[in-house]
From Swiss-Prot:
Protein family per UniProt: Belongs to the BLOC1S4 family.
Localization, UniProt: Cytoplasm
Chief location of this protein within or outside the cell: cytoplasm
Signal peptide start-end: none
UniProt name for this protein: Biogenesis of lysosome-related organelles complex 1 subunit CNL1
PANTHER family on file: BIOGENESIS OF LYSOSOME-RELATED ORGANELLES COMPLEX 1 SUBUNIT CNL1
Additional remarks: Present with 589 molecules/cell in log phase SD medium.
Length: 122
């Protein structure tokens, strides 16, 4: 009995948003959240690395620390690349939404043409 009621709720909610705009909105918000999280992570990592590098310079401890810092800077660059990929996703979303607007307008025009044709034949 519960399966039927949950299925009918899913059908109703799918009927309320057949184009999946709500899911797209949630996905967009999540992408922005991830990007903000990446920026904060990069900021913290950069600050930490700069502080460590300053300690190395001040204390004169240069041996293995530089190699470790280079490895951490490489990780930081990878995070920046990931962030750049997220910005590219946003650009792709902008392109998709622009073409989506055009397709909706075309669908409305086609519908209106069909509606006019159906009313003339009656």
């Amino acid at each position: 009995m519960q399966d039927n009621s949950s299925h009918s709720r899913e059908s109703a909610s799918a009927g309320d948003d057949p184009l999946g705009i709500d899911k797209l909105t949630v996905d967009y918000d999540y992408l922005l959240y991830k990007m903000r999280d990446y920026v904060q992570s990069i900021q913290l990592d950069t600050t930490e690395l700069c502080k460590k590098q300053n300690e190395v310079m001040v204390n004169g401890i240069i041996e293995n620390t530089i190699d470790k810092n280079i490895a951490k800077f490489k990780e930081l660059l990878e995070k920046c690349d990931t962030l750049e990929n997220h910005y590219e996703m946003l650009n792709q979303l902008a392109i998709i939404t622009d073409t989506f607007k055009e397709r909706i307008a075309e669908a409305v025009n086609n519908y209106n043409s069909l509606k006019k044709g159906a009313s003339k034949s009656k």
